[in-house]
Amino acid sequence: MKVLAIKLVDYREWTERLGYDREWLIQKIQNKFMMKIHEIASQYSTFPLQLRFDNFLMIVDGITNTQLIYMINDMQENLPVGIKTCLGYGKTPLEAQWNASVCLNNKEDKFKEYVDEKIAALHFDINFNTEALKYTSLYDSFLEITNIYVDLSRFLYKIGGILQYLGGDNYLGFVSTNSVNKVIEKFSDDNKIKVGIGIGQNARTAIKLATTSLEKIRNNREKTWHIEEEYH
């Protein structure tokens, strides 16, 4: 699988130049440029995992190196600092992002040609969380969501996957297609978490299919998982 690692250059120095009354401004600018990056990424059929805001990842199977260069140039035009990128390859998203991260710090070829793989996206949703908000505080609910995020991250890490919190009680994960059965086995009898699985040629399609799967689960309350796959 192919993962693009993106690092904002001199990001800390940029934030320090904003003065002491800066945190509100940093949040404003971060959200503004991430909104633009999401828009650009969608045009190239991928999706940014925001991570720390100054570093993020993209699953880029199904995208040519030429398209990647165009996308990077488009992003650079909308960022307040420079960026450094590198393309990594691995049998799993976790391995690919590791290789991409290491590549950021050396002088090897940044864009080798790699074979595209199908992408498996996972859209996780917590059962009854909205209803539970009536009986707990906003902060306690947030802590529960955070704990679940940690648990899901650890599980996916063990099978070579990566995870992003989407907001609310939703999470987005990526695994290799070879690991899908492990996800199904894990959540087939789970009455707390449902997972929509989408398999596609690129990240945007896989995510769309994962969300489609999740909606089908919601319409059939007896199921905890469903899978949709793109065929060519």
Curated annotation (Swiss-Prot):
| Catalyzed reactions per annotation | GTP + 3 H2O = 2-amino-5-formylamino-6-(5-phospho-D-ribosylamino)pyrimidin-4(3H)-one + 2 phosphate + 2 H(+)
Q: What is its EC number?
A: 3.5.4.29
Q: Which GO terms describe its biological process?
A: biosynthetic process
Q: Which residues cross the membrane?
A: none
Cite the entry's keywords alphabetically: GTP-binding, Hydrolase, Nucleotide-binding
Homology family: Belongs to the archaeal-type GTP cyclohydrolase family.
Q: What does this protein do?
A: Catalyzes the formation of 2-amino-5-formylamino-6-ribofuranosylamino-4(3H)-pyrimidinone ribonucleotide monophosphate and inorganic phosphate from GTP. Also has an independent pyrophosphate phosphohydrolase activity.
Give the protein's recorded name.
GTP cyclohydrolase III
**Phylogenetic placement of the source organism:** Archaea, Thermoproteota, Thermoprotei, Sulfolobales, Sulfolobaceae
